[in-house]
Amino acid sequence: MNTIQVIIFAVVLVLTVTVGQADEDSAETSLLRKLEEAEAAMFGQYLEESKNSREKRCIGESVPCDKDDPRCCREYECLKPTGYGWWYASYYCYRKKSG
């Protein structure tokens, strides 16, 4: 009789735990969905507006660039090398002069 009671108790315990977890998972999922909807409502328009104002891919410092179509980042400009790089035929992105 004791063994049957232990088995029944174990089965009831397992069922209680699995059903309880299912309820918690569905509650977490619905809460996550609500938070995502609220975030989309609050920040969706802002993200869409700022997406196009972001700087496109650009070339960093000391990287070859095209004189006619420079793709240097804002703080750089496409210049012909001077000094040690005078023998190179192409232009390079260099930091803009601050003066």
UniProtKB/Swiss-Prot annotation:
Primary localization class, coarse: secreted
Modified residues (Serine amide): 98
Organs and tissues of expression: Expressed by the venom gland.
One example GO MF annotation: toxin activity
GO cellular component, one term: extracellular region
Transmembrane segments: none
Compartments where located: Secreted
A Pfam family annotated for this UniProt entry: Toxin_22
KW Disulfide bond (keyword) present: yes
Annotated S-S bridges: 58-73, 65-78, 72-93
Propeptide regions on this chain: 23-57
Keywords associated with the record: Amidation, Cleavage on pair of basic residues, Disulfide bond, Ion channel impairing toxin, Knottin, Neurotoxin, Secreted, Signal, Toxin, Voltage-gated sodium channel impairing toxin
Signal peptide segment: 1-22
Other comment: Negative results: has no effect of mammalian sodium channels Nav1.2/SCN2A, Nav1.4/SCN4A, Nav1.5/SCN5A, Nav1.6/SCN8A and potassium channels Kv1.3/KCNA3 and Shaker IR.
Role played: Has minor, but significant effects on the Para/tipE insect sodium channel.
Family: Belongs to the neurotoxin 14 (magi-1) family. 08 (Ltx-4) subfamily.
Domain notes: The presence of a 'disulfide through disulfide knot' structurally defines this protein as a knottin.
Protein name (record): Omega-theraphotoxin-Bs2a
Species this protein is from: Brachypelma smithi (Mexican red knee tarantula)
